[in-house]
Amino acid sequence: MLSLSAKNHFTVSNSITHVIKSYHIRTLTSSAEKMPHITTPFSTSASSTKLKAFRKVRPVLQRHSSSWIVAQNHRRSLSGQSSLNDLRHLNRFPHHTLKTSNNEFYPAEQLTLEDVNENVLKAKYAVRGAIPMRAEELKAQLEKDPQSLPFDRIINANIGNPQQLQQKPLTYYRQVLSLLQYPELLNQNEQQLVDSKLFKLDAIKRAKSLMEDIGGSVGAYSSSQGVEGIRKSVAEFITKRDEGEISYPEDIFLTAGASAAVNYLLSIFCRGPETGVLIPIPQYPLYTATLALNNSQALPYYLDENSGWSTNPEEIETVVKEAIQNEIKPTVLVVINPGNPTGAVLSPESIAQIFEVAAKYGTVVIADEVYQENIFPGTKFHSMKKILRHLQREHPGKFDNVQLASLHSTSKGVSGECGQRGGYMELTGFSHEMRQVILKLASISLCPVVTGQALVDLMVRPPVEGEESFESDQAERNSIHEKLITRAMTLYETFNSLEGIECQKPQGAMYLFPKIDLPFKAVQEARHLELTPDEFYCKKLLESTGICTVPGSGFGQEPGTYHLRTTFLAPGLEWIKKWESFHKEFFDQYRD
């Protein structure tokens, strides 16, 4: 048992009481009431003021836990209470572990937010932020009481998640995946499988070919860089897409979606606060969140909304120079093409100008090209890899040191297989040593999801003319694409017909990012509620119609402007009419 002379008991205890009495309390918050069950050195009749004062200074006292224990034990022994039972919260450090004479110990306090990596707490991801969280609450409310809200369902226009919004999976994809997941079917007679009308012959043959490449089972780890046969398919796809610019399988890394590739690259090139990454504003929040986790600086460059969200190379170079002056090394330049959330598509000239800056300052370029299949009529996608190769031939030596990482994913396009986590990155201009570093990082996760890798193969090598699935596969793809374009243009035209909204014409991707000139009264009420004005609008929209969007502040925007991001994935057009009605009522309510 713990022991100390009665004199020392009183001395320590009185000293603590003196500290508490002399502590000047200005404000008390609910955080001071974290552990109301803890007995204090005061008697049960102690005043509320003393109790609050004690809780305010408790962290200071606990740094001298031996004195605290003595004082606590003395007070409790006088009242006949247990000396140690409620002192477990003090055991935060090994050298303060409380033990009895028979070497028993009292369990330490659980870790709290104070123990969490600060970088994790700083990271924010608006796509699943406050508004989507509120949407989940309303969804739960509807399930309990369908009549309790002025709408009957939540429309998740906040995230590019096609199959959540009733986009059907491509039949060919799912036939092949089904056979890979249950390979016993592949041992049956092919004609019997075809006669079952569940599988077409080309899907059966493709599954057998993939199974051979994979090594016999999708349940086994693959190599960390990905299945070699699938990487060969990706290289062939890129070579064809880029009109003969050769791609090599050894430069391909299969990944668990494009997000995994972003994590790899930023983990490697972010070395702390002295390094910075150039990101477009508005941007996809994955980048700022990952930078926060890596304790590195975001170096924002603003896209020009008035010219269709174009990229200004002079703006990028200005940001680079300012970073260098502030002793921050710009290591990476992020380009999202087609844009998220803007939907803009870069011209070859704009891409060439970006490479001028990258070559001049030695920044790695991340080309986030996951929406390359989501291209609207009248627009053409040009990969950054293709433009770089052209520049290298036209200007020998000038662009030879440029390092480019190009990303693609099965989550977007007409595939929409977000939950399957398939993707790849192609490295251009990286040395063997740099590729080995990336491979080491990939190896920590062992390998990407093998069925996701198979989906990558299906994405880059769909059925071709003459195969049994070709016509039906083309029909499904065309239907998905046409419906997306119809909804996008309807929403775009609706926005531009409404008071206070201006929206750039979409060129690609699956989002619109309209600017909203909110009435002064709405801005004032938002501030009163401690919300950003665009968050206030999105919250009102959600609670009135069930349409969930993302405030523009989550993506970054020019100071003094307000935007929101919405997808146009939700089926039908009825929800667009509901939005139109809400907007008119909102402006009538808050009109200046």
Curated annotation (Swiss-Prot):
GO terms for molecular function: L-alanine:2-oxoglutarate aminotransferase activity; pyridoxal phosphate binding. InterPro entries: ALAT1/2-like, Aminotransferase_I/II_large, PyrdxlP-dep_Trfase, PyrdxlP-dep_Trfase_major, PyrdxlP-dep_Trfase_small. It is found in: Mitochondrion matrix. Its cofactor is pyridoxal 5'-phosphate. Pathway: Amino-acid degradation; L-alanine degradation via transaminase pathway; pyruvate from L-alanine: step 1/1. The modification Phosphoserine is found at S77. It is an enzyme of class 2 (transferase). It comes from the Eukaryota. Residues 1-64 form a transit peptide. Pyridoxal 5'-phosphate binds at A258, S259, Y284, N340, S409, R421. One of its GO terms (biological process) is alanine biosynthetic process. Coiled coil: none annotated. GO terms for cellular component: mitochondrial matrix; mitochondrion. It catalyses: L-alanine + 2-oxoglutarate = pyruvate + L-glutamate. Its main location: mitochondrion. Induction: Induced by alanine. Its EC number is 2.6.1.2. Homodimer. Present with 9960 molecules/cell in log phase SD medium. Alanine aminotransferase involved in both alanine biosynthesis and utilization. Under respiratory conditions, constitutes the sole pathway for alanine biosynthesis and catabolism. Under fermentative conditions, it plays a catabolic role and alanine is mainly synthesized through an alternative pathway. Belongs to the class-I pyridoxal-phosphate-dependent aminotransferase family. Alanine aminotransferase subfamily. This is Alanine aminotransferase, mitochondrial.
